[in-house]
């Protein structure tokens, strides 16, 4: 009898240990609740620069890449990202960004920052979105590090310390998040 009980327990443990792990459940956001996220952002594109006297330069940058977000408050997991920005080496950066998820739903944001090699802290203000991101608001910040800056204007880089928070709109608050 003891052998039979031990055999049943061993079989139950073996079965439980071989079953797939389940992802922790996430609560659905309530309207007005702030959700925090962090992530990585890598992009490549081009930059056109003009001299503005002395060491000052003006640039237009166009970047496309991928953004992956983590954390229980992330608005989505993966996005295609696009950025256009005007950078003045003395005055900073002003730009716009669009994140597009796998469904085609988008998040729009305004980028502002120091935008210089010595001080490159950038802040994004989420202005809204489409589909499940309709009515979304929030902010995020990061520092940008260029990995490639070629003479022909080709650039490639990544965000360091990307963190933010979002408040989902009424329409998207009751929906599901990936």
Q: What does each model-identified segment do?
A:
Residues 2-8:
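Sec-dependent signal peptide recognition
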Residues 20-178:
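Beta-strand-enriched cores of mature, soluble protein domains
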Residues 14-17:
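C-terminal motif of bacterial Sec signal peptides marking the signal peptidase cleavage site
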């Amino acid at each position: 009898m003891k052998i039979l009980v031990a055999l049943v327990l061993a079989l139950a443990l073996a079965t439980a240990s071989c079953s797939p792990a389940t992802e922790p459940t996430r609560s659905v956001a309530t309207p007005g609740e702030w959700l925090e996220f962090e992530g990585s952002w890598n992009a490549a594109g081009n930059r056109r620069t003009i001299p503005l006297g002395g060491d000052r330069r003006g640039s237009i940058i166009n970047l496309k890449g991928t953004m992956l977000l983590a954390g229980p408050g992330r608005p989505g997991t993966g996005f295609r990202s696009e950025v256009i920005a005007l950078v003045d080496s003395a005055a900073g950066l002003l730009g716009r960004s669009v994140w597009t998820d796998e469904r085609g739903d988008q998040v729009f944001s305004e980028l502002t920052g120091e935008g210089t090699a010595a001080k490159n802290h950038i802040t994004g203000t989420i202005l809204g979105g489409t589909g499940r991101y309709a009515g979304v608001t929030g902010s995020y910040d990061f520092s940008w590090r260029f990995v490639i800056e070629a003479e022909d204007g080709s650039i490639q880089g990544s965000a360091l310390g990307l963190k933010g928070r979002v408040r989902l709109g009424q329409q998207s608050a009751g929906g599901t998040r990936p």
